[in-house]
Amino acid sequence: MPGIKVFGETVLRGSVRVSGAKNATTKLLVASLLSDQRTILKNVPNIEDVRQTVDLCRVLGAIVEWDQQAQVIEIHTPRILLSKVPPQFSCVNRIPILLLGALLRRCPYGIFVPILGGDAIGPRTLHFHLEGLKKLGAEIVISDEGYWASAPNGLVGAHITLPYPSVGATENLILASVGAQGRTIIKNAALEVEIIDLIVFLQKAGVEITTDNDKTIEIFGCQDFYSVEHSIIPDKIEAASFGMAAVVSQGRIFVEQARHEHMIPFLKVLRSIGGGFSVHENGIEFFYDKPLKGGVLLETDVHPGFITDWQQPFAVLLSQSEGCSVIHETVHENRLGYLKGLVKMGAHCDLFHECLSAKSCRYSTGNHPHSAVIHGPTPLQATDLVIPDLRAGFAYVMAALIAEGGASWIENTEMLDRGYTDWRGKLERLGAKVLARDSVSVYV
């Protein structure tokens, strides 16, 4: 299992350039499969999830040229060569499920996707995806091995109301609707900035697609596509991650390309606990300004709320903030397990099955903890940790950087490779001492 040694009591200073958004890039690669036209993507992050998606597209028939130094991918899929996704792709992440929507127009007699893997943050049901596809005319068969979708008579536009504004379901239904005849209206849709980026990409490709302020997306089926050149938006999760690392280490980091309009809920909560930042034309500077004050309710939500991927690193900030703070996780039902690692380091965290806010969420009757109380500030001690999922991984690295008592061993670091480009190099250039397992003797 890949691991690193992270030395504590470190102050991070300098600048870092945020990469293109993981959650936009992977979806745009899938969207390029809608047609046989050429697509050029710029600002592409060199991360494992993108590498896996590129490999998946190649297996399906895409011709891909990736200039990693220039951060540019050119992809062209003259025809689809495979209608069954190899299992090695589904066990890594959840991207393959989007092929059900993206490829039904080009493969009407069936697409098969094996059972999915990804982060250990809950089952994340596919019910919304599959029911929406059925309303468009798809035939769905579910087995122990995976999911089979077909549309031998073609897809037809429909009115779909999602029970919950699921990001993945919204993306899948947008892609399927592009290949349907007529008009599709999706109500209660997710409208995260990555979905808006997908919509802009599709508009460039010739798709008539619009949104409005009440979470409604209107799509007209498209038969004639254009070639597209598109620059991927900066990754708001990576930007916030380095911003939190600056504040918790009592340092100062300029995050180049960070866009404040994508991060307003995060910046609002960061300011409420005393975290410092200043917005510039080409990025955001984050810094430690004064002792952090807790006593906040951090409630995750879909856009335009505080996104769930910011929650885990923010818990490290709350562990160093004076007072009692509450986390209420409303998006994923199993996303607080990582707190055990922070408790091992000395953080004071209590888990609850109840909704610890005035608003009950969809997990209020569930039998799992989805609320937490964090008491701070508490000094953290270096220890051994195993990363359970991507964003918890960065939280553990943040905690290790400020820990007392030497260095922390952190294992399963390949999780970080999924979502952070050159994360180790970026941290080292900011002043961190981060060593791979085979080179630890340098600092011993």
From Swiss-Prot:
<protein>
    <recommendedName>
        <fullName>UDP-N-acetylglucosamine 1-carboxyvinyltransferase</fullName>
        <ecNumber>2.5.1.7</ecNumber>
    </recommendedName>
</protein>
<keyword id="KW-0132">Cell division</keyword>
<comment type="similarity">
    <text>Belongs to the EPSP synthase family. MurA subfamily.</text>
</comment>
<feature type="binding site">
    <location>
        <position position="94"/>
    </location>
    <ligand>
        <name>UDP-N-acetyl-alpha-D-glucosamine</name>
    </ligand>
</feature>
<keyword id="KW-0963">Cytoplasm</keyword>
<dbReference type="GO" id="GO:0019277">
    <property type="term" value="P:UDP-N-acetylgalactosamine biosynthetic process"/>
</dbReference>
<dbReference type="InterPro" id="IPR050068">
    <property type="entry name" value="MurA_subfamily"/>
</dbReference>
<dbReference type="InterPro" id="IPR013792">
    <property type="entry name" value="RNA3'P_cycl/enolpyr_Trfase_a/b"/>
</dbReference>
<keyword id="KW-0131">Cell cycle</keyword>
<dbReference type="InterPro" id="IPR005750">
    <property type="entry name" value="UDP_GlcNAc_COvinyl_MurA"/>
</dbReference>
<dbReference type="GO" id="GO:0005737">
    <property type="term" value="C:cytoplasm"/>
</dbReference>
<comment type="function">
    <text>Cell wall formation. Adds enolpyruvyl to UDP-N-acetylglucosamine.</text>
</comment>
<dbReference type="InterPro" id="IPR036968">
    <property type="entry name" value="Enolpyruvate_Tfrase_sf"/>
</dbReference>
<keyword id="KW-0961">Cell wall biogenesis/degradation</keyword>
<dbReference type="InterPro" id="IPR001986">
    <property type="entry name" value="Enolpyruvate_Tfrase_dom"/>
</dbReference>
<dbReference type="GO" id="GO:0071555">
    <property type="term" value="P:cell wall organization"/>
</dbReference>
<comment type="pathway">
    <text>Cell wall biogenesis; peptidoglycan biosynthesis.</text>
</comment>
<feature type="active site" description="Proton donor">
    <location>
        <position position="119"/>
    </location>
</feature>
<dbReference type="GO" id="GO:0008760">
    <property type="term" value="F:UDP-N-acetylglucosamine 1-carboxyvinyltransferase activity"/>
</dbReference>
<dbReference type="Pfam" id="PF00275">
    <property type="entry name" value="EPSP_synthase"/>
</dbReference>
<keyword id="KW-0133">Cell shape</keyword>
<feature type="binding site">
    <location>
        <position position="331"/>
    </location>
    <ligand>
        <name>UDP-N-acetyl-alpha-D-glucosamine</name>
    </ligand>
</feature>
<feature type="binding site">
    <location>
        <begin position="22"/>
        <end position="23"/>
    </location>
    <ligand>
        <name>phosphoenolpyruvate</name>
    </ligand>
</feature>
<dbReference type="GO" id="GO:0051301">
    <property type="term" value="P:cell division"/>
</dbReference>
<keyword id="KW-0573">Peptidoglycan synthesis</keyword>
<feature type="binding site">
    <location>
        <position position="309"/>
    </location>
    <ligand>
        <name>UDP-N-acetyl-alpha-D-glucosamine</name>
    </ligand>
</feature>
<dbReference type="GO" id="GO:0008360">
    <property type="term" value="P:regulation of cell shape"/>
</dbReference>
<keyword id="KW-0808">Transferase</keyword>
<dbReference type="GO" id="GO:0009252">
    <property type="term" value="P:peptidoglycan biosynthetic process"/>
</dbReference>
